[in-house]
Regions:
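P-loop (Walker A) phosphate-binding loop of NTP-binding proteins
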Residues: 12
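Hydrophobic positions on the alpha1 helix immediately C-terminal to the Walker A/P-loop
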Residues: 20
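ATP-dependent small-molecule kinase phosphotransfer cores
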Residues: 30-96, 132-135
């Protein structure tokens, strides 16, 4: 099977991007990269705790100051195919990554109630405890501000949308099928 040289992942919080990344890395040998890692590095450089409630405004600040595709611009030089880019949250990041020949964007999604339940299970610092708080945080990630997170607009650019509302086995099958369909 011919595989895309660079695969990008986008999707809302707790949709299964991490599990999708594991499948691509462990089963297909993709080298993992994350735009969030670029933010974590910047947060640490500034002496900030690299948690979601710090990273989101930091990312918005960087996009305003240096352009909406800045995180992808910083990462693109580190990519050596086969590579996986996780945490794509702005259409300008997709635009930058589309400069890589054969780049494919996968959007991972699941119903909000299931994603909230997954979020509670993983219990990361700063994760929403109530469904109301979860929805509120999600609304903040879907803004019209070109320098902010625009998850819905980013997902709309996906080459393939994967629904992750079933089992891990189902997700694995969907991911491998998507990679095969997108291979060149």
């Amino acid at each position: 099977m011919v595989r895309p040289p660079v695969i990008g992942l986008t999707g809302p919080n707790s949709s299964g991007k991490g599990k999708t990344a594991e499948i691509l890395v462990e089963e297909l040998g993709y080298a993992p990269h994350s735009l969030s890692d670029m933010l974590r590095e910047e947060a640490r450089r500034r002496g900030l705790e690299p948690v979601r409630d710090v990273l989101i405004p930091l990312g918005n600040e960087l996009r305003r100051a240096r352009g909406a595709g800045v995180l992808a611009e910083l990462l693109i030089e580190r990519l050596c195919p086969p590579a996986l880019v996780d945490s794509i949250r702005n259409p300008a990041e997709v635009e930058v990554l589309r400069r890589v020949p054969g780049f494919v964007l996968l959007a991972i999604d699941a119903p909000v109630e299931l994603r909230h339940a997954r979020s509670l299970e993983r219990a990361r610092p700063g994760d929403a405890r109530t469904i109301e708080e979860f929805n509120e945080k999600e609304q903040r990630e879907n803004t019209a501000d070109p320098s902010a997170q625009q998850l819905a607009a980013t997902a709309a650019l996906a080459d393939v949308v994967i629904s992750n509302s079933g089992s891990l086995r189902d997700l694995r099958r969907e991911v491998l099928d998507a990679v095969e369909r997108c291979g060149h």
